[in-house]
Amino acid sequence: MFYAHAFGGYDENLHAFPRISSTVANDVRKYSVVSVYNKKYNIVKNKYMWCNSQVNKRYIGALLPMFECNEYLQIGDPIHDLEGNQISIVTYRHKNYYALSGIGYESLDLCLEGVGIHHHVLETGNAVYGKVQHEYSTIKEKAKEMNALKPGPIIDYHVWIGDCVCQVTTVDVHGKEIMRMRFKRGAVLPIPNLVKVKVGEENDTINLSTSISALLNSGGGTIEVTSKEERVDYVLMKRLESIHHLWSVVYDHLNVVNGEERCYIHMHSSHQSPMLSTVKTNLYMKTMGACLQMDSMEALEYLSELKESGGRSPRPELQKFEYPDGVKDTESIERLAEEFFNRSELQAGESVKFGNSINVKHTSVSAKQLRTRIRQQLPSILSSFANTKGGYLFIGVDNNTHKVIGFTVGHDYLKLVERDIEKYIQKLPVVHFCKKKEDIKYACRFIKVYKPGDETTSTYVCAIKVERCCCAVFADWPESWYMDTSGSMKKYSPDEWVSHIKF
């Protein structure tokens, strides 16, 4: 029998190997072919995976053989030999490679009482001393420097995994290397497929949705859920209900299993979706009444059109046109907004002849809240204009009455606001499908607002004009993650995110 440590299967009375406890001590070095659900897979020659468990303050690590499999296998799936005998279960994974856990090659069994252990990828060409890696000359000088110190008790172990050699070093409190082991085998570190989340704490919903996204984008895995509250399963289901927007992606990839004090969410990635699992795309489009964030399918359609067309050409300039009073079509509103944008001064309380449209947005804010609102709202509003038809944002015009209000600030503060606007626009990520790769084109003006009889004023309306962009403008990086080999969750950049789309 084989028991996965990820599911609480560690038993000190059984044989223990990286990630599993078992009733038999199986030497997995002797196999060249294994079978999972009647499909055969070859063991990779001369390449291994360093796997470990940390259970009950015990570290169990070893170099294990691995096999290549392009299908998703879940933790605990049985692995058989060619005669049909079960020899292990699925534990660790690195991309399309799965470890075969049991008696492997070089191993490390430690008591973690009072010591830590760290794992590193050893970069090609680098040498190692203690807890650092660098080019050989730098490491040589480091070793000379540290040799002058007296050795102290070991406080940390460092496991270095390289393409041709693996090493284990130990260090004292000063970073002096106390001991070293070398294994003349090339290996990889697994992509961790177990994430621990506590519910009932601050940001638990964010942590849960982030973990779901990261695991689905990394081939699948398990989330171990604990809670201070008694009914962990009840609390978990409440949190899952609150992130229902993710269920369109994960509903058929998720299974919740109740344990005594914790729950396990088992997930697999079907690789059939054209999009990565994404909490928020941060791609916005402008409608008549609002700036709306695209969901994954809307983003796919929008980006597909851009990719097929190779980007968009600039919109032609508006032609001068005499229009009767009361006309409220989009083109007329845009012309009125252009005229308003070019005004040299405004009167407090005057009525603006146009309201919000697909090209125009009004907003009013106090001087005290001005920079905060710009930071919070500018990226989504301006990127939505850039992704649609371009447009105008007027800060200081009441959204309901359409009257000029403005905001009153000093000259120095106005310069800070201007720099903020420039900074936030320049930070907007653009993913290009065209050859020109042009920047976002915009103009910003501060129009003075006078009260009747005043000759001077410190009241302004901020007017920002954004042209339609050639390609896709993001308000921020998409909220879409993956697991790296260190066990950290990393967010995809916009370019990385788009590159993973199956157009």
From Swiss-Prot:
Gene3D superfamilies assigned to the protein according to its UniProt record, in alphabetical order: Schlafen, AAA domain (3.30.950.30)
Record-annotated active site: H15 (proton donor), Y136 (shared with catalytic histidine of dimeric partner), K140 (proton acceptor)
Site (Substrate binding): R58, I103, N147, Q167, R180, R182, K184
Region listing for Poxin-like, in residue ranges: 1-236
Induction of synthesis: Expressed in the early phase of the viral replicative cycle.
Domain of life: Viruses
InterPro entries: Poxin-SLFN/SLFN_N, Poxin_vir, Schlafen, Schlafen_AlbA_2_dom, Schlafen_AlbA_2_dom_sf
Entry remark concerning the domains of this protein: The substrate binding site is formed by the N-terminus of a monomer and the C-terminus of the opposite monomer.
Additional remark text: In some poxviruses, the poxin is expressed as a poxin-schlafen fusion protein.
Protein known as: Poxin-Schlafen
Organism: Monkeypox virus (strain Zaire-96-I-16)
